[in-house]
């Protein structure tokens, strides 16, 4: 293996071990402007996009001890390395894809040491974020409490109304 390829292989291995997960993409009709915009969007969620040869990427996976079936075909592969939350990176890819006429195709991914198919990665990206889930839980907890407060308020209002009516009758 040539020195340049060895260096690239080592660099990809480091990215695999440093990342919390990664997403494999096929990119269709991706212009330089799309690529730049996509990379900027990913940097907001601590992720980066790399275009790599499939052979080098899967060799790096193998030497890093990560098991994943190589995709069919030759050529290049788009890889999103997520250094933060991999689900946020997947959501960012999905959002970008919606805005740019499905120019990206999910092939596979690895999140929380689990290998996922392209469909599974896309399904994970469609799930609510942790922030949204927390808001839903708080809403579920707060709703019964507000109902109890409303009931207590109406009961107390009824008691006060009865006391007021009784006081008016005794004054007459």
UniProtKB/Swiss-Prot annotation:
Gene Ontology CC terms, in alphabetical order: large ribosomal subunit
Keyword Ubl conjugation: no
GO molecular function term, any single one: large ribosomal subunit rRNA binding
UniProt keyword annotations, A-Z: Ribonucleoprotein, Ribosomal protein, RNA-binding, rRNA-binding
Keyword set includes Ribonucleoprotein: yes
Disulfide bonds: none
SUPFAM superfamilies, alphabetized: Ribosomal protein L10-like
PROSITE patterns attached to this UniProt entry: RIBOSOMAL_L10
Source domain of life: Bacteria
GO biological process: translation
General function of this protein: Forms part of the ribosomal stalk, playing a central role in the interaction of the ribosome with GTP-bound translation factors.
Family the entry assigns: Belongs to the universal ribosomal protein uL10 family.
Protein name per UniProt: Large ribosomal subunit protein uL10
Gene of this entry: rplJ
């Amino acid at each position: 293996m040539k020195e340049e390829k060895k260096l690239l292989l080592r660099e990809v291995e480091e990215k695999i071990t440093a990342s919390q997960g990664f997403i494999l993409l096929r990119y269709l009709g991706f212009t330089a402007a799309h690529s730049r915009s996509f990379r900027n969007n990913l940097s907001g969620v601590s992720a980066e996009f790399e275009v790599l040869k499939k052979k080098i990427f899967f060799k790096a996976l193998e030497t890093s001890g990560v098991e994943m079936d190589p995709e069919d075909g030759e050529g290049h592969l788009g890889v999103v390395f997520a250094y933060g939350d991999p689900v946020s990176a997947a959501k960012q890819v999905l959002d970008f894809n919606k805005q740019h006429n499905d120019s990206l195709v999910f092939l596979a991914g690895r999140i929380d040491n689990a290998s996922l198919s392209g469909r599974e990665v896309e399904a994970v990206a469609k799930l609510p974020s942790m922030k949204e889930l927390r808001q839903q839980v708080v809403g579920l907890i707060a709703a019964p409490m507000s109902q109890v407060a409303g009931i207590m308020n109406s009961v107390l209002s009824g008691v006060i109304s009865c006391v007021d009516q009784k006081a008016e009758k005794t004054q007459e």
